[in-house]
UniProtKB/Swiss-Prot annotation:
S-S pairs: none
Segments traversing the membrane: none
Protein name stated in the entry: Acyl-homoserine-lactone synthase
Primary role: Required for the synthesis of OHHL (N-(3-oxohexanoyl)-L-homoserine lactone), an autoinducer molecule which binds to a yet uncharacterized transcriptional regulator.
Species of provenance: Enterobacter agglomerans
Length: 216
């Protein structure tokens, strides 16, 4: 089973946090070459703190994917790291969250789930399920052009709030991610058509999804 659930920073075990930060280093530094802070072969920053929650996707006791959530009223990447690009955007009041450090470990996902399993779409849907379960109003995030393309392809009716440039040829985008029933079911139906899971299982939180890996 693919288990997707959330855990607080304080409740992360040492083994799990080390694995998480090492996979983030592989994704964001080694593969994407982002300007991120790394130490001891791990990637973490000032937003990995007691106000943070992580969404983890685990299969066969191995971490496959993750997202980081922070209350939008707390210091986060939108209001601090990229304040020079998006500081003129008036963010809404209310129970919104910011998501960041979205990743799927491609090697583990392919080996454990198979190359055709729609793990990115499942992770998008899990973000909606998490936010709805915890009573949040919506999600804001900053993404690269590549991630924007993947999100649009999923059918999620995201809203681009503003484009900014971290360098001359490197745009990033501030997005509002809707979490209403309509978008939840759009993604659930897309995933159902590409997997063994039914709509009810896909819209639960936490999530427990049957996956039959491809036969090689």
């Amino acid at each position: 089973m693919l288990e997707i659930f959330d855990v607080s920073y304080n409740d992360l075990t040492e083994r799990r946090s080390e694995d998480l930060y090492k996979l983030r280093k592989i994704t964001f530094k080694d593969r994407l070459d982002w300007a991120v802070n790394c130490s001891n072969d791990m990637e973490f920053d000032e937003f990995d703190n007691s106000g943070t929650r992580y969404m983890l996707g685990i299969y066969d006791n191995q971490l496959v994917c993750s997202v980081r959530f922070i209350d939008l009223r707390l210091p986060n990447m939108i209001t601090h790291t990229f304040q020079h690009l998006f500081g003129d955007v008036k963010l809404p009041e209310g129970d919104y969250i910011e998501s960041s450090r979205f990743f799927v470990d491609k090697n583990r996902a392919k080996a454990l789930l198979g190359s055709r399993y729609p793990i990115s779409y499942v992770l998008f849907l899990s973000m909606i399920n998490y936010a709805r379960h915890h009573g949040h109003t919506g999600i804001y995030t900053i993404v690269s052009r590549a991630m924007l393309t993947i999100a649009k392809r999923s059918g999620w009716e995201i809203e681009v709030i503003k484009e900014g440039f971290v360098s001359e040829n490197e745009p990033i985008y501030l997005l509002r991610l809707p979490i209403d029933c309509h978008n939840q079911h759009l993604l659930a139906k897309r995933i159902r058509d590409q997997s063994e899971s039914n709509i009810a299982a896909l819209c639960q939180w936490p999530m427990s999804l049957t996956v039959t890996p491809e036969q090689v």
